[in-house]
Amino acid sequence: MQQTMQAQQLRRMAERSAVAFLLAVLCVYPLYIDKFSNLGVVKFTGVATLSWAFCLWLGALAAIGARPRAGRLPWRTDHGLWALGAVVATGVVSTVTSLSPAMSLWGLGGYYGGCMMVLFTAVGYLAVRAFAPQKLLNGLTFCVGITTALVTVLYVLNIFNIDLIGTYADTAVVERAQFFSTLGQKNFCSGFMAFALPLVFYAFLVARGARHTVFYGVPAFFGGLALAVVDADGLALGIGAAVLVLLCQKIFTTRTLRRLMVIGMFFFADAGWMQYMRTHVYTQGGKPILAAFGHYAQLGFAVCAAVWAVLFFALRSREIPLWKAGRVLAAIAVTLGVVLVVLANFMPGFPSLGKLDDLLVFNDDWGTYRGTAWRISWSAWTAQPFWRKLLGVGPGMMHTAVAQWAGADITARMKTFYAAHNEYLELLLTSGVLGLAAWVWFVTAHLRKAAQNWLRPGVAPVTLALVSYLAHAAVSIRVSMIFPEIMLPVSYTHLTLPTN
């Protein structure tokens, strides 16, 4: 009896420690600010120390008797755990065979992060999956919302050269305009928002009662502001993908649509304000793709308000399921997008669609020369010997591999790229076919499990966040410091309901 009570006390201590770990990684760590933190060694050291400290503490608790609840780590039957092992194994192998093993170990050759990042993130994933309480996510989402609001406010202040904490004290104004972001560069902020905003918005969509609606509505307002200011095509793509998935779920009713209209009003109000500020106050810096809606802010706000009013006053408290219509709408949107991309790129004489050509036509200039990064990364991979095609050139070695491939023909533009600006292409080059296959296996296993566990607490918002990030990754960088932010909550898709 005494041993049972001791084991329960140790488990509760481990669960509290897992909660603290998640809060530290998701809510406190993103607020750590250093200049140009995509490559920040100090920031990497911070997250590595944070992760290893918590993981060692949880490991010590497990060693003296703390046991996870039944079914948390069924390694014999769980494809997700085997896939995680494959991701780690391929990362280790590609590091050992890297063009520079030392740089690949620590991830000092580029934005992507190295083998050490994969190792401590994998251990953190196992720790959270073993001990994190399943009902934690409501409180965690609120804390993530507060962090999102703070990050967004600091981001906006930096756009207008208001540097409250001296992040850019010795940085030229022009450089600030190019690299404005409270987290060093916009890529970190884009990746963080791609994962955090679906959590924040979903909490507002399902909030019941006035108190919860206000609590989650405030972060949702700042989430709308983030969409209007964060200069990243990937963020727009990610949020769009998450919305399409949401439309297909049975949760999508007239009530959900009404809340979406409120988020729409938040966004158009924020976009209109930012459009005014950029026009009359500050004209430097990048301009996000969604900021174009600032030109139609009044019309967009009015449409959202009208739809909300019709749904609220006409239906009162009734909820009408809309998920069937949502699936039709999602299918039409995806089909139309695919058809337009195929026609714009492969049909000779296809008429111009104006500014949409910047999105639909893939060439070297796409996304501020991101197309160049894709082309040279693919070319560098195809130039590798067969064994390197399988194992990769090593984490963080994209720039080195491109330089070796281009040789004397390397251009000034090529020299600026330290990442492929596409996570899947980056994995193919740095970790090879085996590394990419392992990551796809891991993601697929978790998405399949998420579909099965959709109604369990915490699964739906994490799944939408994962979908958003995976879409974002197709046109953006996996900034290494974001990797733990993604992997730890993803474990929620595999959590089982407590049995004791």
For every predicted segment, state its role:
Residues 32-45, 169-182, 281-292, 372-373, ...:
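Juxtamembrane membrane-water interface segments that cap and precede transmembrane helices
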Residues 185, 369-416, 431-435:
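TM-adjacent membrane-interface loops and short helices in multi-pass inner/ER membrane proteins
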Residues 79-80, 166-173, 357-387:
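Extracytoplasmic loop-helix module adjacent to an early transmembrane segment
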Residues 493-499:
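Conserved small/polar residues in nucleotide/adenosyl-binding loops
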Residues 2-11, 71-75, 318-325, 500:
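Membrane-interfacial, low-structure loops and terminal tails that flank and connect transmembrane helices
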Residues 105-114:
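Non-cytosolic membrane-interface motifs at loop->transmembrane helix junctions
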Residues 63-74, 94-105:
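Transmembrane alpha-helix boundary signature
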Residues 6-10, 16-32, 50-65, 85-97, ...:
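Alpha-helical transmembrane segments of multi-pass inner-membrane proteins
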